[in-house]
Amino acid sequence: MGIQNIPEHELARLREKAKEITGSQFDYQSSYTELLSRRLNGEPLQYIEEYVPFYSIQINVDQRCLIPRPETEYMIEIIKNNISAPKKILDVGTGSGCIALMMKKLFPDSEVHAVDISNDAITLAKENAEINNLEVNFYQSDLLTNVEKLDFDLIVANLPYIPTCNLPTLQKEVIDYEPLIALDGGEDGLLYINKLLDNLKNTDSNDLLLVLEVDTSHAQSLRDSFTDWKDVKLEKDLVERDRYIVARK
């Protein structure tokens, strides 16, 4: 990547970050050069800035987590439109904690739990909870392995859904910097989603709402596989692609 490939708005953000680091509006060139070098090497701007805005909160991000995408942020709207006052919420594959923390902010009276297979991600999510002064129960778990009781009103999941063979086609900055464990969905991209659905065959909830973010190429076939669920529907993302599955059990 050459400097001519970096948009001016990104250069401006790097300058602001350099000023923040140095505490100076003028003597920041050395820091700016270092940050620019990192960006030229392909490091995502969000990791360099160390945070991203997510809906109405701020989330710290680094290589312990996947950078939240607009599709995941829009998932909050999907949830809001489908449930009003869940008492108990579970976020599966929480990563930075962004969805779980927004759930707690939107539904402050709810008990919110969030799990991830990565201990590093859980540590970061706890840091983000402290930064945003929000109380969420974060703990390490391979999907639902360490979840004691499945008595949730709402389960949200944004699990890895990229087929292993497609990983080399991703942008270089994604492959080189973001955690592959948060991207690799196995041979067909459905490994973890199918495991989660299998885990949910028996729940302790009388009225469970499940909201999944999925690959657009999987959406239709996945919806058709929800044979023991009711009110199964697809919801579209910001560019009108089938991106979310909403189902009740």
Language-model features, listed with the residues they occupy:
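Non-catalytic nucleic-acid substrate-recognition regions in nucleic-acid-modifying enzymes
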Residues: 1-11
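Conserved SAM/SAH cofactor-binding pocket of Class I
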Residues: 74-169
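Conserved AdoMet
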Residues: 13-78
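Residue-level signal for inorganic ion chemistry
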Residues: 14, 42, 72, 99, ...
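Conserved Class I SAM-dependent methyltransferase catalytic core
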Residues: 187-248
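Mobile active-site "lid"/loop adjacent to the S-adenosyl-L-methionine
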Residues: 161-191
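A general structural signal for well-ordered alpha-helical segments in protein cores
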Residues: 11, 32, 42-45, 96, ...
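Short loop/edge segments at beta-strand edges and connector loops
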Residues: 49, 140-141, 214, 236
